[in-house]
From Swiss-Prot:
A lipid is attached at residue 230 (GPI-anchor amidated serine). The normal, monomeric form has a mainly alpha-helical structure. The disease-associated, protease-resistant form forms amyloid fibrils containing a cross-beta spine, formed by a steric zipper of superposed beta-strands. Disease mutations may favor intermolecular contacts via short beta strands, and may thereby trigger oligomerization. Contains an N-terminal region composed of octamer repeats. At low copper concentrations, the sidechains of His residues from three or four repeats contribute to the binding of a single copper ion. Alternatively, a copper ion can be bound by interaction with the sidechain and backbone amide nitrogen of a single His residue. The observed copper binding stoichiometry suggests that two repeat regions cooperate to stabilize the binding of a single copper ion. At higher copper concentrations, each octamer can bind one copper ion by interactions with the His sidechain and Gly backbone atoms. Residues 23-230 are annotated as: Interaction with GRB2, ERI3 and SYN1. Cu(2+) 1 binds at residues 61-63. It comes from the Eukaryota. The lineage of its organism: Eukaryota, Metazoa, Chordata, Craniata, Vertebrata. It comes from Gorilla gorilla gorilla (Western lowland gorilla). Monomer and homodimer. Has a tendency to aggregate into amyloid fibrils containing a cross-beta spine, formed by a steric zipper of superposed beta-strands. Soluble oligomers may represent an intermediate stage on the path to fibril formation. Copper binding may promote oligomerization. Interacts with GRB2, APP, ERI3/PRNPIP and SYN1. Mislocalized cytosolically exposed PrP interacts with MGRN1; this interaction alters MGRN1 subcellular location and causes lysosomal enlargement. Interacts with APP. Interacts with KIAA1191. Interacts with ADGRG6. Cu(2+) 2 binds at residues 69-71. This is Major prion protein. Residues 23-38 are annotated as: Interaction with ADGRG6. Belongs to the prion family. Keywords: Amyloid, Cell membrane, Copper, Disulfide bond, Glycoprotein, Golgi apparatus, GPI-anchor, Lipoprotein, Membrane, Metal-binding, Prion, Repeat, Signal, Zinc. It is linked to PrP is found in high quantity in the brain of humans and animals infected with the degenerative neurological diseases kuru, Creutzfeldt-Jakob disease (CJD), Gerstmann-Straussler syndrome (GSS), scrapie, bovine spongiform encephalopathy (BSE), transmissible mink encephalopathy (TME), etc. It is found in: Cell membrane; Golgi apparatus.
Length: 253
């Protein structure tokens, strides 16, 4: 924590020094330069007092001769011929309208990031989430027959588990127990609907497989949970808050 505080202090000093140098940089202009120290004086040979509004002589608002608001001949507000307010042919909108094309829907990146970080919430399962796909573990069941049966049928068993956020459970055992039950139930119902049935041997092996996968899922969730907690503790400490606040004050000021 002390090393982290030192690095934060070094970063703060470096940023503050850079801001100080930026403020001391001379502004462009001066004698014998391309810029002008006096805004009212143009380049040599040019008009020192151009008319206000950016137009030519006799142009009150930046348009051509007889153009009151910057449009072409007979254009009162800067549009093309027959365009009252600057749009295209038959358009009454601004210059950025393009033949009434519908705007494309924008993707909400916050929602996408939240779904990727927390897993996909499964509708109709009361807040359960579906974990990412896993490789089915190598398990020995104590007999050559069961081991061979598992190798031949492991593709029929789930490779993803259903779970709830770990902060809803008091310990790992409760998390794993609930995870195993809901995963086997959902997989059995889905598979039975397709016309495939499971034997007692299948159920026994699925329980072992899903249990190992639920333990792995708990370890992943636990690691992510503590990482989020550590980040919150770091940025909520008084020294870090003070440094960040002072840095923001220097940038804004």
């Amino acid at each position: 924590m002390a090393n982290l505080g030192c690095w934060m202090l070094v970063l703060f000093v470096a940023t503050w020094s850079d801001l100080g140098l930026c403020k001391k940089r001379p502004k462009p202009g001066g004698w014998n330069t391309g810029g002008s120290r006096y805004p009212g004086q143009g380049s040599p040979g040019g008009n020192r007092y151009p008319p206000q509004g950016g137009g030519g002589w006799g142009q009150p608002h930046g348009g051509g001769w007889g153009q009151p608001h910057g449009g072409g001949w007979g254009q009162p507000h800067g549009g093309g011929w027959g365009q009252p307010h600057g749009g295209g042919w038959g358009q009454g909108g601004g210059t950025h309208s393009q033949w009434n094309k519908p705007s494309k829907p924008k993707t909400n990146m916050k929602h996408m990031a939240g779904a990727a970080a927390a897993g996909a919430v499964v509708g109709g399962l009361g807040g359960y989430m579906l974990g990412s796909a896993m490789s089915r573990p190598i398990i020995h069941f104590g007999s050559d027959y069961e081991d061979r049966y598992y190798r031949e049928n492991m593709h029929r068993y789930p490779n993803q588990v259903y779970y709830r956020p770990m902060d809803q459970y008091s310990n790992q055992n409760n998390f794993v127990h609930d995870c195993v039950n809901i995963t086997i139930k959902q997989h059995t119902v889905t598979t039975t609907t397709k016309g495939e049935n499971f034997t007692e041997t299948d159920v026994k092996m699925m329980e072992r497989v899903v249990e190992q996968m639920c333990i792995t899922q708990y370890e992943r969730e636990s690691q992510a949970y503590y990482q989020r907690g550590s980040s919150m503790v770091l940025f909520s400490s008084p020294p870090v808050i003070l440094l960040i606040s002072f840095l923001i004050f220097l940038i804004v000021g």
